[in-house]
Structure formats: structure tokens, C-alpha cells
From Swiss-Prot:
UniProt source species: Synechococcus sp. (strain CC9902)
Main location: cytoplasm
Residue numbers binding ATP: K251
Motif 'KMSKS' region mapped to chain: 248-252
Protein name: Tyrosine--tRNA ligase
GO MF assignments: ATP binding; RNA binding; tyrosine-tRNA ligase activity
EC number: 6.1.1.1
Reactions listed under catalytic activity: tRNA(Tyr) + L-tyrosine + ATP = L-tyrosyl-tRNA(Tyr) + AMP + diphosphate + H(+)
Amino acid sequence: MPETNPSLPSWLNRGMADLFPAGEPSDVDQSLAARLAAAEAEGRPLRVKLGIDPTGSNIHLGHSILFRKLRAFQDAGHIAVLIIGDFTARIGDPTGKSATRVQLSKNDVAVNASTYLRQLGQDQPKETALLDFETPGRLEVRYNSEWLEGMDLPAVIGLLGTGTVGQMLAKEDFSNRYNSGTPIALHEFLYPLLQGYDSVAVNADVELGGTDQKFNVAMGRDLQRHFGRGTQFGLLLPILVGLDGAQKMSKTLGNTVGLEDDPLSMYSKLEKVGDTAINDYVTLLTDLNVEALPENPREKQKAMALAVTATRHGTDAAAKAQLDAGNLVGGAGDASADVPEASLLAVNFPAKAFYLMSAVGICASSSEARRQIKGGAARLDGEKITDPNQEFASAAELDGRVLQLGKKTFRRLTA
């Protein structure tokens, strides 16, 4: 992560990967510190935009980094403008994609959006919610169909006229696909312009995004200038590495920790995070200082897992999860080293639970595995497996987790 900006408050600096522009310190269009100072002098909060396309139904910890920063702005007295991309989700963000996304129906997007808001804490007290839905004036939830769905053809053509094909092909994802001969649909070029126009529609002062979103965030600033509006700052945060320690956290890769994972499952997964990722997890997912972590690598893992789980579920639930994880393998403290390992190398993924149990040798056959699961004897990291057909996407999703049969049989799965 880059060096902190001494002119900005510590809560804003924390975890920041990039801030642009970062020009003349006294210019409110070039310096976020100057914009903050001017807003305070005028007695007005900044409008901080975060756009999300509800293309799935679950939020994981990798997504939560941006929501945590948005909440920090709320707690500092600013307005969080959460844009639900119910229109743009029907196109699909081409960022990071090697092929055109499958377009979603309007109904699919609406269902996903409702699920997202629930997970963000729409029905929770602000003390436990990821975003503050309670404090008046701190949150606007906007749907970009408000301003995009009614655009007529002249308006769309005018928007297209603000960008060039050269600009779009300079975007790495488009460039790679073009150079490899992979088709790029024309509507995909429209996506960055539509997302950028969201910033015009809501008069954003700041837009949050991952480091992979810099092109789209910069497009918003360009369009604000084109339409004669005040221009936003782009504040980018790192992409969280997944449980495999190699690639970004992604449901497709099976290396995620879900926001709705129960405390024991969340703690048990986090306890296996590799040494190189621990500091980033602490910085991006908690308010704990990295310097406060134990030096011992194993104790450091456990401290991180406890802190992250507590951030989501509270300190009592996290402490119980840590205790339960220690007792999971039949002894007090950390007995995890005594659990026999079972390799996943011979397992064909995606793998259903009944097949997995027979493939790693914890059950003699698939039929026995089905019986054991239906009888309530099978657990993964202490959480009961209830469906024999529960599917696991990859070895990375299971690496380091403990598969249990009954009270005495355990296997630590290794990729």
C-alpha cells in the first residue's frame, strides 16, 4: 500500500491504494484535503458515491472493504450515496472479464439488490450494520434506472460522443480481448460511460472503487467536467486476496468468506489465511493496528481471525467461535496440528459433499457418505453438512478446513 497522505485524517488514509487527482494542496478540484476543509467551512457534508451492480446474491469480505470505507465517511458526518446499478447490471461490467457477460433480467437484478441491502444492514441497528441506515441524512440509496432508463436516443448518442474508441481500447480488459480476437459487444463500450454518468446524476464529490475500477472512476470525473459539474476525487482501495493466498477473493474461484457466514465458519476459514495476507486482512477488514498483533505466526493468524469475526458478529460471538474452533478437534487449545491431513489432489471439482467424503477416505463409499450426512454426522469446520448434494467449487475453497465424521474422525483438507 502507498504511503499515507499527511494532510488527510487517519481514517481516510487507512488502506487507501490510490487517490486522484493529488495536485495543488490549496485547489479544491485537485486536493481532497482542500475539498474537505472547504466543505467543513461551508457546513456541508461531502457526497461520497459507491456504485454496486447486483449481479449476484451474496456479499463477501472482499466486497466489504469498500462498504467499510463508505461507513467511515458516514461516521465522519458525510453523505454516503449508494448507487444500486439496477440498469447497468443488465449490461454487466466488463472489468476483469475475458468475454461478454450474460445479461440479467430486470427481476433477477431486483431480487439481488434486495438481498444486498439486507446484508448491508438495512434492518439492523447501526452498531452492527455495515452501513448506517438509521442516522438521518447520512445515506442515500439510489437506483441508476432513475436517470438511465428514460434516456432517449439523442441523449445516448450525446453520451457516446463524450468518449472515443481509442479510450475504450486503452482499457486493459478491452485491449486484451481485442488483441486476442475475442469479440467485444458494442454495448460493453457504453458501460463505463453509463457508470460515469451516475457521478453526474448524484453530484459526487468522491467516488470509491477497487484498484481495478480506476478507468470507470476517472470516466465519472471526465463526464462531470463535460456537463459543467464539480468534479469528483477517485479513492481506490486494494483488491483483497482470497483464502488461497494467490488470487482475488471471488465466488467463482471458491476462495471467499461470506458476509453471512456464521461465526464459527468465518473464524475457521480466516484462521487458515496465509502469513503474507494477514496484515492486509487486519488493515482492510478491522480497526485493529497491525503493530498490536502477536509476533508468533500461528497466534497472529488467530488474532486476525478473531478481530475480523468480531467486526462482523461482535466480540462475544467471535470469542465463542475461537473456543469452538479450538475444541473442534477434540481438545482444549490448539490441537489442530494433530488432525490427519487428506489431500484434495485426486478430487474432481466441482465436488458434491457425498462424493467429497468418499474421495478423501472419511467414508468408505458415496452411499455411506449420503447416509452419514442425512443422519447429521458430517460437519465442515464444525458446521453441520445437511445436504449430500452441497457443491464445492474448487480445492481452494476447502484448503485447510476440517472435515468431521461423528465425534472422533477428523481430516484436515489440503489442496
